[in-house]
């Protein structure tokens, strides 16, 4: 079911310029890895959510399966930077992608951080064998 958006707000996840208990849903795509302070971001998200509000954060993650993990690692360390260099002339930017995924906390740590910083429940939806994950947090208030 598609629900039309009433208002869309773009802003700093570490300092959301909205009153408390103001929004129904927060969505974020491929940004968690780039935030400097995950606990603060989750505190801000939970602060602005209305009761029963939900946050959905899609990001690239590391597979847990050892075979997928090694294949994913090799793909990110060799193929992605090479293709980035060939098509964009920028090896370094695409190397950053691999590094940011490697340094990103595990899904369990993300879920625990959500629950320690304002979310009453947090769960993950694993996609493509763990190459991407949607983190879903709910605030009851």
Positions of the model-derived regions?
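Conserved Rossmann-like nucleotide-binding pocket used by diverse enzymes
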Residues: 9, 27, 56
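A short SAM/SAH-binding and catalytic strip from SAM-dependent methyltransferases
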Residues: 24-38, 61
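Conserved SAM-binding strand-loop segment of SAM-dependent methyltransferases
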Residues: 2-16
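A short glycine-rich, Lys/Arg-flanked "PGG" loop and its adjoining helix->strand segment in the class I
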Residues: 39-54
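Core SAM-dependent methyltransferase catalytic element
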Residues: 111, 115-141
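C-terminal alpha-helical "lid/dimerization" subdomain adjacent to the S-adenosyl-L-methionine
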Residues: 58-113, 117, 123
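A short acidic, Gly/Pro-enriched loop at the edge of an enzyme's catalytic core
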Residues: 14-26
């Amino acid at each position: 079911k598609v629900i039309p958006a009433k208002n869309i707000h773009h802003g700093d996840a570490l300092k959301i310029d909205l009153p408390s208990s103001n929004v129904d849903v927060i969505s974020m795509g491929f940004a968690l890895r780039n935030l400097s302070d995950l606990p603060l971001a989750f505190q801000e998200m939970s602060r602005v959510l209305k009761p029963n509000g939900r946050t959905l954060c899609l990001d690239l993650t590391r597979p847990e399966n050892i075979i997928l993990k090694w294949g994913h690692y090799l793909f990110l360390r060799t193929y992605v930077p090479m293709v980035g260099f060939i098509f964009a002339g920028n090896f370094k930017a695409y190397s950053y992608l691999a590094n940011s995924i490697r340094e990103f906390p595990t899904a369990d740590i993300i879920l625990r951080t959500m629950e320690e910083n304002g979310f009453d429940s947090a769960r993950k939806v694993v996609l493509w064998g763990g190459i991407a994950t949607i983190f879903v947090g709910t605030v009851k208030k």
